Amino acid sequence: MSTMAERDSDVSEPSRSRPRLGLRRGRGGGGRGRGGRGGGGGDKGGRPPIGLLPLIVIAIALVATGIGAIIVSTSYDTPREAKVLGPNLAINDGASNPLDLSANNSPALVRNPREAGNLVVANRIDSPAYSCSLHVSFDGGGRWTQTPIPAPRGEEPKCFAPDAVFGSDGTLYVSYVTLKGRANAPNAVWLSRSPDGGKTLSAPVRTPLGAKAFQVRLTADPTAAKRIYLTYLKADELGLYTFSNTGNPIMAVRSDDGGTNWTDATRVSGPSRQRVVAPSPAIGKGSELNVLYLDLGDDVLDYGGGHRGRGGAPYDGRWQLVLARSTDRGATWRESVVDDAVVPTERFIVFTPPFPSLAVDRDSGTAYAAFQDGRDGDADVRLWSLRSGAGEWSEPVRVNDTRTGDGTAQYLPKLAVAPNGRLDVVYYDRRADRTNVLNEVSLQASFDEGKTFLPRVRLSDRAFSSRIGFGVERDLADLGSRLGLLSTDDRAYAIWTDTRNGSVRTAKQDIARSVVGFNDPPRLSSASETALRVGGALLILLGIGTLVLALARRRAAARKAA
């Protein structure tokens, strides 16, 4: 905060000498001057008249008060900052074991609303065999232990696509898919519960989703302790790297008793949408269920497996980003198009697409959507927002602070909203590698509802290759479908798939984490700041005007006395 030194000013009156006129004063006092008794009026003509000095004091006080108001308005301009707290930490047990070649990816990160230090991460493992992993911390992410996920009886031991969420009563729910056969097709979706923050899991219960339920996601209503939702893509026939038919819908089911009983499935995506993928659910301010997904339009390259599972140039058409919303707990749905001109930036296997991210500010009701987009010539992170009660989504905001069209990719964003309204975005970032291969992980934060963002904070303390993972031999290395992010008023907890301990040969992937701390100094409201600055300026002008008036009166009095 700046300081102001006060200066004491002496306002002195220059002495004025009037020439004597040579009149001699008689005894009777007839020679009195006009200024009063004893002929002293000639000397008094240069003194300030009564009321002049108070005007000068008032003028100085007004100017000083105005300057003080402006200083107060600027004293709250301390810049907000974000800083990484400590080194990266691997979450999975086998990260430091060179014999453990597990490909861990697609992490989900959740927090117990009843115990702030209780964090849980669920992730899938693609190789050397399909499986799932659950990691639990009770000290805010400092130490992690692994909890075994129980295998359902009668199913092949191939767990896939786990997800996790805490209910408002602190119950942890974990969903996962079991795969079947040489094609590794989804056979069933299961749900386990934990009453102790993830230390133990109950025997799994089969959900009604059935076989060929892809891209399953789990969410919970924070206002109803046992209300949970599952969203998924209901597929028909499968082929190699493809759904054999179009028209596979996105569906949703609800349980109001923690997964014991379920509603009938309802269709989320409209019947005219023939190629939809990657449903991402989130609960809104009024407990409405929101589902963000991609409509691939005519993209048969990815949806139809036209690339035959090999990397190369992305689809050259456009996708739509769509939000479906239900205000009656999933019974009926209304859609809004977030953006109808999303430019694809990569190829993908349709069974495991990159997911867009959705977050809702439960205080303001604003919904935020994020995804990568190539309209500027390379992959950039874009953000869209929909204010509560608004009919249309905002124009996209480019989040990453790289030079436009620099040829590097920023992609797979994950959003989170802190209780104080701060919006955080974490994403993979190749800005430091002109060959566009090595990843870093970056986080950017917005304090004005996504209009502007702080400069990026690098979370990963080492760059790592984006070409390590399952599918690398086909130039389609899979780092997973998402990153994980949690936000509190003064922290952000981020997790991602990290390949620094792997190689093209081993395909080893680990789950790494980082913590970011924020300083959020007290701020004046924009109205208060404007009032102080405008009011201060007016006081300064008024003080200057008063001083000018005082000086003018002094000069006038001096001329009159002369």
Model-identified regions with their sequence ranges:
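Extracellular, repeat-based ectodomains that mediate carbohydrate processing or recognition
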Residues: 48-562
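Terminal targeting segments of Actinobacterial cell-envelope proteins
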Residues: 2-50, 555-562
